[in-house]
Amino acid sequence: MAKIIGIDLGTTNSCVAVMENNKPKVIENAEGTRTTPSIVAYAEDNEVLVGASAKRQAVTNPENTLFAIKRLIGRKFDEEVVQKDISVTPYKIVRADNNDAWIEVRGRKIAPPEVSAQVLMKMKKTAEDYLGESVTEAVITVPAYFNDSQRQATKDAGRIAGLEVKRIINEPTAAALAFGMDKKEGDRKIAVYDLGGGTFDISIIEIAEIEGEHQFEVLATNGDTFLGGEDFDSSVISYLVEEFRKESGIDLKKDMLALQRLKDAAEKAKIELSSSQQTEVNLPYITADASGPKHLAVKITRAKLESLVEELIERTAGPCRTALKDAGLSVSDIDDVILVGGQTRMPKVQDKVKEIFGKEPRKDVNPDEAVAIGAAIQGGVLQGDVKDVLLLDVTPLSLGIETLGGVMTKLIQKNTTIPTKAQQIFSTAEDSQTAVTIHVLQGEREMASGNKSLGQFNLTDIPPAQRGMPQIEVTFDIDANGILHVSAKDKATGKENKIKIQASSGLSEDEIQKMVKDAETHAEEDKKALELVNSRNQCDAMIHSVKKSLTEYGDKLEADEKSKIEAALKDAEEALKSGDKEAIDAKTQVLTEASHKLAEKMYAQEQAQAGQQAGPGAGSASAGQSGEKPVEGEVVDAEFEEVKDKK
């Protein structure tokens, strides 16, 4: 039976794990590392690079190297957080036809789930290489505070990658599974503080033994889906840019290549300062002006870094206190605090966690791998390999509909255990009203306009009646993935309409199917693209060689021979523009055959010159000064071989 793998699809890095002999195992990728950068690069000639290879070329290809795409998934272009990202990312974030935030790469608009699918495909391949068998099913994690649209978009990404997503689970819950599976210490309440590359979550979870069953119940969750290590990096980048501007008067903000180098340097400096008190950012030739090249050299102390990101760290305190309040607990009720996400390695973050919860956070959980391990355990539960484990998760935000006066009426409160179902009766607002619009919302604000719109649909053909008379039953049903299904039914006629909330990724079923097919044919396309590149390179090399030789030896050819070669050259150049591999190969062959006569003339001339050489020393020197040496230089290997054979 094929394994269900667990994937932590992270903002900065991703990780994959699987259950093996009843134990979760993190799988190393082809590069030998246990985590993979969540970076996708679109090179020329349609080549797609994922992970470390994409990260390595980012400095030279910033506009087409996509990172932190998870921050855009399921978001609208006009959202404030998206607009903020536009000002700091080297790649182009654009408005899609349905007002979603998409990315434009090499003239093509790409949906965030399609980019995330590339990372998931890399994770899938990593697992397949290790297991030696095909993988088609996965448990994928998302931030606990992801809304319905973001969850649906993540599920779409899985489908595009060729994976059936058996379950979407929250990252802190997955980390709790990883922490608590082997703990037999009785009932305990834990706080999972998850500060990753792009998102922050806090979950209060109760781990209990109930009739021999290991139960993980989420009591409350909170967070910020636009707060993470990327923001810490941005603070360091802004500081470096400002320091350089003060010193040189040059603003690096509009220099994409410089910004990409700064991003790499800022991330390295931030990591170094977790274990040392001072580091130096050294970037030679960062830019240049009329006076020459400029170099950036800035010392950063740990204290300086902490002052730069103090506000970001403080932003995590509010959600922690809210989660405790929602769970009906005080700080003293928490037995353990677990740190998840690479950014929690920063000493100042650990100090803040200790300050909030009044106790030292535990260090026995790997912050980079815990989430993937938990996802693999959940995969084992779904497969039946892991027994006696019950996971009770919650919906992070309240769900409801817009009612008269633009008010949001909540049907399901935040932190309700899922799966769950809720029903409520509504009526019409006007006399003789024959249709109602059900506008589905998610959020905590009282007014509809302050909440996230998840979608809307109409219930029509309601028999005319006085306002308030018809009875419209609205049902909200949240599945185990936290994805919402809504229906509305006229109780008088039995007429019903329903909607499965589509992600604001805006991907219709047809678009998803198209992307699935694109992904399936991607390997074949890669092969064809590589063959085309090779053919182009061969043709280009032949054109260059023939042109050069024609310039030097063309006068020794008959007129018809020369015109034949020139015609073949022109045809080959035209074929290069077409991108048709067969045409390029054919014209390369024609050019090769047409240039045979030219090669004969070249060979004859070289033989004549070789015969005129007086001696190896003097001959070489005089030839070098005669102006004829460059001709020999072009065929230097063959020419010297010839001479040695003769002597």
UniProtKB/Swiss-Prot annotation:
Q: Could you tell me which Gene3D superfamilies the record lists for this protein? A: 1.20.1270.10, 3.30.420.40, Actin, Chain A, domain 4 (3.90.640.10), Substrate Binding Domain Of DNAk, Chain A, domain 1 (2.60.34.10)
**Which GO terms fall under molecular function for this chain's record?**
ATP binding; ATP-dependent protein folding chaperone; unfolded protein binding
Induction / repression: By stress conditions e.g. heat shock.
Instruction: Give coiled-coil spans as residue ranges.
Output: none
UniProt cross-references to Pfam families, sorted A to Z? HSP70
InterPro entries for this protein: ATPase_NBD, Chaperone_DnaK, Heat_shock_70_CS, HSP70_C_sf, HSP70_peptide-bd_sf, Hsp_70_fam
Is this entry keyworded Protein transport? no
Q: Which SUPFAM superfamilies match?
A: Actin-like ATPase domain (SSF53067), Heat shock protein 70kD (HSP70), C-terminal subdomain (SSF100934), Heat shock protein 70kD (HSP70), peptide-binding domain (SSF100920)
Q: Where is the composition biased (Low complexity)?
A: 604-627
Region listing for Disordered, in residue ranges:
602-647
Q: Which residues carry this modification: Phosphothreonine?
A: T199
* Keyword annotations of the record: ATP-binding, Chaperone, Nucleotide-binding, Phosphoprotein, Stress response
In the record, the note on similarity to other proteins reads: Belongs to the heat shock protein 70 family.
Question: What job does this protein perform?
Answer: Acts as a chaperone.
NCBIfam families attached here?
Answer: PRK00290.1, PRK05183.1, prok_dnaK
Q: Which PANTHER family match?
A: HEAT SHOCK PROTEIN 70KDA
Q: What is this protein called?
A: Chaperone protein DnaK
Q: Which organism is it from?
A: Nitrosomonas eutropha (strain DSM 101675 / C91 / Nm57)
